[in-house]
């Protein structure tokens, strides 16, 4: 399950280190190329709203295979794109159908008992972190060697392989809700309004993930301009420092099981804020940027585990819908962060980017400070 999550989620992030060369191919400005990343995340958010809730009513393996088929076609379309608009539409469709990890995560949570749910979610999150980091690293290297289109073809091959592995090895799992699709979607609004823990978790992760997108959407612009003037391959390598996120998520899972998700949530927000304080004060010193990237990745990914542990304790029969709502808000925050990051870069460069990230984290911290543990509150 962790491996499947990693390969699938990579599709959402592979374009972040390609933006400079995409802009060059189509003669576009950096801000125009940044729309590729923004619309990918908007598509992912809509997919979480419209598709992920189906995991509560349909057999999940069949649903995942169907999504892989459409995502594969979107990758081919992106690789063949003849204009920036074509590429943007292809990436939007790719984001819309690459919601496979968010169908798998509630399944993994349901297979775990309450005492070990944080640990299980932390293990699955390792795959997500590795997919995010791998996407940036591999896409940067591939772009520097063979061009950005080659990355889409490689990802297409990975999706075909993943479909085969899921068909052969993934467990059959049927949803437990018996609602028509229309009623399923109509149930989302009341569910969101009913659960205060869900709303606060959505705001917390949406804002910290927005700050994450602010940073990683624009760091390529910073590192490929003077005084750095690095290639896209080096930009991808810088993102590799976030491997700390993969190391930290199982640790956070154990902290959640012992001290509660809300405690972990607050610590993650603090780590993210510190990362931007480092980036804004020493952004033109590469070791400081690497440390900032490390702390931000750890904080963002670990916060996701903490928030999901909280919301999955609310209702066993609605886990896909809870996760869908949660991820909608997460990736709307990510899309907002991508847009604001490029906007801030074009006006105030790196200082503006960092201030934008800190404002988003401050908004997320306001939610984290008022959050109590969900249904499996820590009682030790």
Q: What function would you assign to each model-found segment?
A:
Residues 100-112, 302-315:
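Intracellular juxtamembrane helix-capping segments at the cytosolic ends
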């Amino acid at each position: 399950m962790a491996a499947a999550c990693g390969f699938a989620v990579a599709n959402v992030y592979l374009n972040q280190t390609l933006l400079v060369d995409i802009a060059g191919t189509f003669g576009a400005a950096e801000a125009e190329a940044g729309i590729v990343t923004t619309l990918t995340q908007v598509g992912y958010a809509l997919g979480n709203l419209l598709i992920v809730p189906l995991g509560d009513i349909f057999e999940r393996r069949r649903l995942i295979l169907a999504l892989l088929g459409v995502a594969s076609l979107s990758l081919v379309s992106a690789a063949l794109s003849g204009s920036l608009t074509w590429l943007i539409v292809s990436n939007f469709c790719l984001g819309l159908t690459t919601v496979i990890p968010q169908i798998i995560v509630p399944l993994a949570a349901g297979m775990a008992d309450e005492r070990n749910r944080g640990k299980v979610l932390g293990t699955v999150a390792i795959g997500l972190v590795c997919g995010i980091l791998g996407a940036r690293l591999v896409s940067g290297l591939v772009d520097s060697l063979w061009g950005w289109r080659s990355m889409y073809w490689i990802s297409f091959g990975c999706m075909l392989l993943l479909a085969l592995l899921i068909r052969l090895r993934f467990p059959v799992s049927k949803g437990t809700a018996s609602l028509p699709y229309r009623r399923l979607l109509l149930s989302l609004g009341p569910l969101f309004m009913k659960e205060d823990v869900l709303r606060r978790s959505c705001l917390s992760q949406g804002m910290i993930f927005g700050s994450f997108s602010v940073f990683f959407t624009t760091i390529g612009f910073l590192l490929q301009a003077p005084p750095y003037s690095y290639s896209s391959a080096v930009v991808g390598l810088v993102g590799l420092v976030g491997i700390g996120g993969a190391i930290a998520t199982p640790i956070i899972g154990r902290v959640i099981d012992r001290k509660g998700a809300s405690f972990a949530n607050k610590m993650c927000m603090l780590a993210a804020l510190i990362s931007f304080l480092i980036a804004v004060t020493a952004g033109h010193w590469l070791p400081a940027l690497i440390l900032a990237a490390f702390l931000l990745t750890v904080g963002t990914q670990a916060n996701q585990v903490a928030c999901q542990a909280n919301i999955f304790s609310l209702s066993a029969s609605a886990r896909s819908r809870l996760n869908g709502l949660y991820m909608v808000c997460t990736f709307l925050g990510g899309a907002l962060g991508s847009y604001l990051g490029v906007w801030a870069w074009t006006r105030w460069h790196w200082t503006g980017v960092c201030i934008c990230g800190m404002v988003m984290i401050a908004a997320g911290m306001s939610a984290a400070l008022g959050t109590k543990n969900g249904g499996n509150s820590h009682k030790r």
